[in-house]
Amino acid sequence: MPAQGSQRGLLGAVNFTPTATPHLRPAANQTGPQCLEVSVPDGLFLCLGLVSLVENTLVVAAIAKNRNLHSPMYCFICCLALSDLLVSVSNLLETAVLLLLEVGALAAQATVVQQLGNVIDVLICSSMVSSLCSLGAIAMDRYISIFYALRYHSIVTLARARRAIAAVWAASILSSTLFITYYDRTAALLCLVVFFLAMLVLMALLYVHMLIQACQHAQAIARLHKRQHPVQQGWGLKGAATLTILLGVFFLCWGPFFLHLTLIAVCPQHPTCSCIFKNFRLFLALIICNTIVDPLIYAFRSQELRRTLKEVLLFSW
């Protein structure tokens, strides 16, 4: 079993079998270029997980409390919050188990610990897949609300949204189970990478199309009211900035992790790739940072949700 928290498996779960390690990470003693390794202390890792846990729990509680938020759009936001919550919980659980094992406070048989590691692996992987699917579902929901506004309520019903969410979780659990089973197969790694790229392309296409449509609509209104051209440009720049932040956060937080998976499949023994593998803990921390940012982008911008959140906080006190 690994002796330190930095020796994590592919998904950040606990890898206890030495025979599995070569599949997940190349040997650390390879000769090659000097590596830059960014250390993420366990304390910081735990703090990020706790912030994400509290933040996403509040989002779920606010949506559950207010019946006005029981709409398809907020169902997808709630699904995203639940996924992000599980990402933080699974990483918190993993870090806690590793720390307890390191200090000798937790004693267990190797088979029991291995089974626990597999459970955490499945939990982490399924929550990550469902989080990506939820981001794609939110983008599609917003796209339909703009381009099919008159038919939106007949296309995106609450029942269909719930079925879509159920399908997302079923697919996430199934895919994560298969991935953990065949983690040492290159095809399994590439499937996850292709899935991430598909979500990135889907979100980029949908949001760019929405931005173009919004700019055209703003120009039409400006011509109608005979506004000045700089006003139109300012609105377009604001929309472009919002789009850049939305897609930029997604890519910066998730991209390094999937780059890690790609390099494991492409160059597992190359010295340069080995340098990147040493920062795997940082890549997991970036994903947890994304679970902290998601509520700020998708949930807390809603005035109704913020009002309900205040009520939840006041009630808890």
UniProtKB/Swiss-Prot annotation:
Q: What is its main location?
A: membrane
Extracellular topology ranges: 1-37, 94-118, 184-191, 267-279
Q: Name one Pfam family in it.
A: 7tm_1
Annotated glycosylation sites: N29
The UniProt keyword set, sorted, is: Cell membrane, G-protein coupled receptor, Glycoprotein, Membrane, Receptor, Transducer, Transmembrane, Transmembrane helix
Gene Ontology process terms (BP): adenylate cyclase-activating G protein-coupled receptor signaling pathway
User: Which membrane topology term applies here?
Assistant: Multi-pass membrane protein
Task: List all membrane-crossing ranges.
Answer: 38-63, 73-93, 119-140, 164-183, 192-211, 241-266, 280-300
Record text on subunit structure and interactions = Interacts with MGRN1, but does not undergo MGRN1-mediated ubiquitination; this interaction competes with GNAS-binding and thus inhibits agonist-induced cAMP production. Interacts with OPN3; the interaction results in a decrease in MC1R-mediated cAMP signaling and ultimately a decrease in melanin production in melanocytes.
Name of this protein: Melanocyte-stimulating hormone receptor
> Gene behind this chain?
MC1R
